[in-house]
Swiss-Prot record:
This is PH and SEC7 domain-containing protein 4. Residues 921-976 form a coiled coil. It is found in: Cell membrane; Cell projection, Ruffle membrane. The keyword Iron-sulfur does not apply. Residues 776-892 form the PH domain. Guanine nucleotide exchange factor for ARF6 and ARL14/ARF7. Through ARL14 activation, controls the movement of MHC class II-containing vesicles along the actin cytoskeleton in dendritic cells. Involved in membrane recycling. Interacts with several phosphatidylinositol phosphate species, including phosphatidylinositol 3,4-bisphosphate, phosphatidylinositol 3,5-bisphosphate and phosphatidylinositol 4,5-bisphosphate. The keyword Zinc does not apply. The gene is PSD4. It comes from Homo sapiens. Widely expressed. Highest levels of expression are found in placenta, pancreas, spleen, thymus and peripheral blood. Residues 438-456 have a biased composition (Low complexity). Residues 1043-1056 have a biased composition (Basic residues).
Length: 1056
């Protein structure tokens, strides 16, 4: 820093090496004269122009005091050495670095300071630090050469520093930085005071000079005092120095002081607006002891910016040289230049190129590569009120990693515009060491391959200062962050333009190409570096490394790169490995795509591929859900659309697996609504249960809104869901139930008649009869019905025992009761809406004449499969016989074979459950089945009669025996009737039921012809009153008479 007397915090040995091996040496014969100040245009007569030198990035040299009258040569390496800027009235001034000390000695007393060439400071804006009274054109020809002892001393001290840095590199101890700093302070050489002065020296402006005054000065003041044509601006290397330095293997892969960055320089200080921060007692700038007053600091001179005169304020030189490490196994000296090596060790700057200057054919090389000297900083170096802290967490193994992974990109040096045609230059290889700080001419791709650490810390881009206040990110680790799409890592990036890649130098013979575009794998974007734009070309080998196109959002105006999520409207990458080691290739995606598009699958078959508990099924489910876009939808709306795509079937845990994948997808599409996937999954399952409770066949009170909210308390990752959200979901499901998807084939079929009866009239809601309108109609007519017994033989209550007249229709195996006075003779007509009472199934039923009922004539009874008993009265006896025959024929034709009897340890008799579904067999098969059932029932009845219970046995056993006997006798009679009717049906030549009835009547009449016999009589009519004629009147005693006056009050006592 200019005028800063603080001791260095971080030593960098190559700064001292550059200090003594730089441009102070005379060029080799046949070589273009070397300049200490690089300019864009040829030199012109010096006018009033202020030359503002901006301190280089991490390379400020702590120089011991110099006597008066002592002048030192320009030292260091330079990149752009083609000429001086036109000396115009131009002011390059910014605020002086805040870390500069106020007690800096004024310029004068014969002490002048050289500008140390900093290749890393080649793209940064220059500060106008020259005072109005600075000497102009003080660099005069004929300055004396530096003596030979200076070169020997340089080699000696450089060897010591290089050895120390090698020790630090081998030990791989990060904490050695502080100890090395103290050691390097002692190793700093004290230049001899009797060195001959060089007219190319000039002193830095005073420290206490205000930046505002500098910026207001007229242009052209304080111009640098070196001219290109000066023959003695740099001493020439002798044979001894060349053999001692360039042939020494110790320095072939030595750390370099700076890396060239085209017109860029990292400022280590903050602007004056934050000057108060750095002056604290704990600041390293204030803890360093000042240098003697009779000395001035060496100022590293840098070249002007990319053509724009805007200066950057708040930049200063670091108070110490920072070491930069290179792999010692790589030799990139003159051999690499001679062989045309494609790349040199990463991070080398133009200082190395200058060391190759003694070669006759060598010339100063123009480097366009942006170098990244530093890896990860230990503290925030941003100008936002943060002092410069010592670097920490330096990883030596990260510095020495070879084999860069960054693609090699050839850049057209924009500084070729600044060269003169008469200075041919060789192109030397240069490799970029990437770091998470970007420059206007180099911005990394978001998904370019990772690069290894090339330096101890990140270097911020000056372009961030041009656009605003640079934000230097703090990195906690000692290793460079890797370039990935992770948002947490991409937050360390400064976006300014192009992509950082391995950069190459252009040969001197090429003409400048301003305005060329950056080309990277088919994606072109102009480099935003001011007036001159470099050209980047990818080689064939580099196309294999650059696999991802540049993100168009990475522009200099954006402070941070926008990391793209891998799942925004896209499926997950197919290269991920599953838990069992199976690679998730395109097999799962192809199957999911076919399931989503229903290519060869039905909606009812999709769930079977998503609900299994294995890795492949989970992968298919994840890929399947990736086709759904739930962004901006509510949870119930997204669930409705999802349930329309597939039939959610299977067991509870299988459905839960599918719903979990739905929850993951919904949370991915709407990450801000719910805190986690579990909360979405919990609410999804609650909605499914609510739909079942509100719209299912549940018995009891439905769930209320308050109960729904209460049941979800504490299930939102320990908290509660918003009540407004739960209320909206509740009323959405209550007003409209969740519709299930159905196959298209099912919707195309004609719906079967499913009568919707009131719930109160359905005594057995789970007993659903097959009501097919396509089955034939056996008979219809007017019948009076009376319910005598309910299911299981229970007596029907008194209020339901009355006789009712219905238009009865026997269709298939169902007996329908319709309204009277309407025509119901149409075949295939749906009876929905015409039924006035519950239909009765006649499967496994038996109709017989009701001989025991004498109150009404022409009455027959019907015993159903569930042991109900109905009484029907027909208009005539013929109608009664016809109804009995046709009801039994329908039962024999459509009754399926019974299930096997249940097996249990109870001795209590339980009637077997008979199937409700219709039989699918033919009449012959039905006949054989009924014969087998008849034989089985007859055998069971015979066995029961053989095993009679004991007369003195318990009453329960006797009752069980009686019930079993009645059932077996009824089953035997029923199957006998079925067999008889089916035999007559099979023997009937026509399908007409009328002809079948006539044949059946003839067979029944021949067998049932009455025989002549005596009638049984009794002496006392009162013994058998049931056999007495109905017209006989029997006078009873008053005590035997019953009146309803006494019974009704007793039965209705509680109701009165």
């Amino acid at each position: 820093m200019m005028g800063d007397y603080r001791l260095p915090d971080h030593p960098q040995p190559m700064e001292i090496l550059n200090l003594y091996l730089g441009d102070s040496l005379e060029p080799h014969p046949g070589e273009c004269p070397r300049e200490t100040c690089s300019h864009e245009d040829p030199p012109e007569p010096f006018e009033e122009q202020t030359w503002a030198t901006d301190p280089p990035e991490p390379t400020r040299q702590n120089v011991p005091p110099w006597g008066s009258g002592v002048e030192l040569t320009h030292l260091g390496s330079w990149v752009h050495q083609d000429g001086l800027e036109p000396c115009q009235e131009q002011t390059r001034a910014t605020d002086p670095p805040e870390s500069t000390r106020q007690d800096a000695p004024p310029w004068g007393s014969g002490v002048e300071l050289t500008h140390l060439g900093s290749p890393s400071a080649q793209r940064e804006h220059r500060q106008n630090t020259a005072s109005p009274g600075s000497p102009v054109n003080s660099h005069l020809p004929g300055s004396p050469k530096q003596n030979r002892s200076t070169s020997t001393q340089v080699v000696f001290w450089a060897g010591i520093l290089q050895a120390q840095m090698c020790v630090l590199d081998l030990e791989e101890e990060l904490e050695k930085t502080e100890g090395l700093k103290a050691g390097l302070k002692c190793c700093l050489p004290t230049p001899p005071v009797d060195l001959p002065g060089d007219t190319g020296l000039h002193s830095s402006p005073p420290e206490n000079e205000d930046s505002g005054e500098d910026s207001s000065e007229p242009e052209g003041e304080g111009q640098a005092w070196l001219r290109e044509g000066t023959p003695d601006s740099s001493p020439q290397w002798g044979a001894e120095e060349e053999s001692m330095f360039f042939s020494n293997p110790l320095f072939l892969a030595s750390p370099c002081s700076e890396n060239s960055a085209s017109g860029e320089c990292f400022s280590w200080g903050a602007s004056d607006s934050h000057a108060g921060v750095r002056t604290g007692p704990e600041s390293p700038a204030t803890l360093e002891p000042p240098l003697p007053e009779d000395t001035v600091l060496w100022e590293l001179e840098s070249e002007p910016d990319l053509g724009d005169g805007a200066a950057i304020s708040g930049h200063c030189t670091p108070p110490f040289p920072v070491p930069i490490y290179k792999p010692h196994s790589i030799c990139w000296a003159s051999v690499a230049a001679a062989e045309g090596a494609p790349a040199a060790p990463p991070g080398h700057g133009e200082s190395e190129g200058d060391r190759l200057g003694p070669a006759p054919s060598a010339a100063p090389c123009v480097d366009e590569a942006l170098t990244w000297e530093s890896g990860c900083v230990g503290s925030d170096l941003g100008p936002a009120a943060h002092p410069v802290q010592p670097w920490a967490s330096l990883s030596p193994e990260g510095w020495q990693r070879g084999g860069p992974f960054w693609p090699q990109v050839t850049l057209n040096s924009q500084d070729r515009d600044e060269r003169e045609g008469g200075h041919p230059q060789e192109s030397l290889p240069c490799t970029l060491a990437p770091c998470p700080w970007r420059s206007p001419a180099s911005s990394p791709e978001p998904s370019s391959p990772e690069s290894e650490s090339r330096g101890p810390g990140p270097r911020p881009s000056p372009a961030s200062s041009q656009e605003g206040s640079p934000q230097l990110q703090h990195h906690s680790s000692g290793i460079l962050p890797k370039w990935t799409l992770d948002a947490s890592q991409s937050s360390l990036l400064e976006t300014d333009g192009e992509q950082p890649s391995s950069l190459k130098k252009k040969e001197a013979g090429e003409a400048p190409k301003p305005g060329e575009e950056v080309k990277s794998e088919g994606t072109a974007r102009p480099a935003e570096t001011g007036d001159v734009q470099p050209d980047i070309h990818l080689t064939s080998a580099e196309h294999e490394n650059l696999r991802t196109p540049m993100n168009s959002s990475w522009l200099p105006g954006s402070p941070m790169p926008q990391a793209q999520s891998p799942e925004e409207g896209q499926r997950p990458p197919a290269g991920d490995k599953l838990a069992n080691g199976v690679r998730n290739n395109k097999v799962a995606w192809n199957l999911a795509s076919r399931l989503y598009r229903l290519e060869g699958f039905r909606k009812s078959e999709v769930a079977a591929y998503l609900q299994k508990n294995n890795d492949f099924s989970r992968a298919v489910a994840e890929e399947y859900l990736s086709f759904f876009q739930f962004g901006g939808q509510s949870l119930d709306r997204a669930l409705r659309s999802f349930l329309q795509a597939l039939v959610l079937s299977g067991e509870t845990q299988e459905r839960e697996r599918i719903l979990y994948q739905f929850s993951r997808r919904f949370h991915h599409c709407n990450p801000g609504i719910f805190p986690s996937v579990d909360s979405v999954h919990t609410l999804t399952c609650a909605i499914m249960l609510l739909n079942t409770d509100l719209h299912g066949q549940n018995i009891g009170k439905s769930m209320s809104c308050q109960e729904f909210i209460t049941n979800l308390n504490g299930l939102r990752d320990g908290g509660n869901f918003p009540k407004e959200l739960l209320k909206a979901l509740y009323w959405s499901i209550r007003s409209e139930k969740l519709e299930w998807a159905v196959d298209e084939e099912d919707t195309a079929r004609p719906e079967k008649a499913q009568p919707s009866l009131p719930a109160g009239k359905m005594s057995k809601p789970f007993l659903q009869l097959a009501q097919d309108p396509t089955v034939p109609t056996y008979k219809q007519g007017i019948l009076a019905r009376k319910m005598h017994q309910d299911a299981d033989g229970k007596k029907t209550p008194w209020g339901k025992r009355g006789w009712k007249m219905f238009h009865t229709l026997l269709r298939g195996m169902v007996l329908y009761f319709l309204k009277q006075g309407e025509d119901h003779c149409l075949e295939g007509e749906s009876l929905v809406g015409q039924m006035v009472d519950e239909p009765v199934g006649v499967h496994h039923s038996l109709a017989t004449p009701a001989t025991h009922y004498t109150k009404k004539p022409h009455v027959f009874q019907l015993r159903t499969a569930d042991w109900r008993l109905y009484l029907f009265q027909a208009p005539t006896a013929k109608e009664m016989s016809s109804w009995i025959a046709r009801i039994n024929l329908a039962a024999a034709t459509h009754s399926a074979p019974p299930f096997p009897a249940a097996v249990g340890s109870q001795r209590r008799f339980v009637r077997p459950i008979l199937p409700v579904g219709p039989a699918q067999s033919s009449l012959e098969e039905q006949h054989r089945s009924h014969e087998n059932c008849l034989d089985a029932a007859a055998d069971d009845l015979l066995d029961l009669q053989r095993n009679l219970p004991e007369r003195r046995g318990r009453g329960r056993e006797l009752e069980e025996h009686r019930l079993r006997k009645e059932y077996l006798e009824y089953e035997k009679t029923r199957y006998e009737t079925y067999v008889q009717l089916l035999v007559a049906r099979l023997h009937c030549p026509s399908d007409a039921l009328d002809l079948w009835e006539e044949q059946l009547g003839r067979e029944a009449g021949g067998t049932r012809e009455p025989k002549l016999s005596l009638k049984k009589s009794h002496s006392s009519p009162s013994l058998h009153q049931d056999e007495a004629p109905t017209t006989a009147k029997v006078k009873r005693n008053i005590s035997e008479r019953r009146t309803y006056r006494k019974i009704i009050p007793k039965r209705n006592r509680n109701q009165l």
